[in-house]
A protein has these predicted regions:
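Short loop/turn motifs at secondary-structure junctions and domain boundaries
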Residues: 1-3, 9-13, 134-135
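Short beta-strand segments
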Residues: 3, 41, 151-153
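Second-shell loop/turn segments in exported
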Residues: 6, 38-41, 116
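Catalytic nucleophile loop of clan PA
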Residues: 10-30
Length: 161
């Protein structure tokens, strides 16, 4: 359960969707999931993920999720999958969708994404959170390592189906 805030706020069927509020009275998330087996443990979607969705709904009446069309593993996961792969920072591209924008960009399985628009990336969740702030059709620049050489790849974000 990545990208979620763990909370002890009571979440029951029918009351999910309410705000998660910090001690300053600020909304920091939307309560959404309760684990049945663990009494008193719930999860909320962070407000930084919700905000672009709400803004899109208020302006356009809908939300189109921007899409890169790839899946990557965090550096910490790689040794469990293949201990011959070594890199200092970034995320390892493990899969490229056949119909996504990454397919035509020149990205390859095995590339290491180190930055998006000059912002360092070390977790897939960081990449996802950044993409949440973008719109379908926006162009992003990915800095990648391939064969220990740095390259910049520009990708126009697609619409997630």
């Amino acid at each position: 359960m990545e990208d979620l805030i763990q909370t002890d706020a009571t979440i029951n069927p029918g009351n999910s969707g309410g705000p998660l509020i910090n001690t300053k009275g600020e909304v920091i998330g939307v309560n959404s999931i309760k684990i049945k087996e663990a009494e008193g443990i719930g999860f909320a979607i962070p407000i930084n993920i919700i905000k672009p969705i709400l803004e899109s709904f208020s302006v356009n009446g809908n939300f189109e999720e921007a899409y890169l069309g790839l899946f990557a593993y965090d550096k910490e996961v790689i040794p469990y999958l293949d201990n011959s792969i070594n890199f200092d920072s970034g995320i390892y591209i493990a899969q490229i969708s056949v119909d996504g924008p990454s397919k035509t960009s020149g990205l390859k399985v095995g590339d290491i994404i180190t930055k998006i628009d000059d912002i360092s990336i070390n977790k897939m969740s960081e990449l996802r959170n950044y993409i949440y702030t973008k719109k379908v059709g926006d162009e992003v620049s990915l800095t990648i390592l391939r064969n220990k050489k740095e390259r910049v790849v520009k990708i126009k974000l697609g619409k997630k189906a």
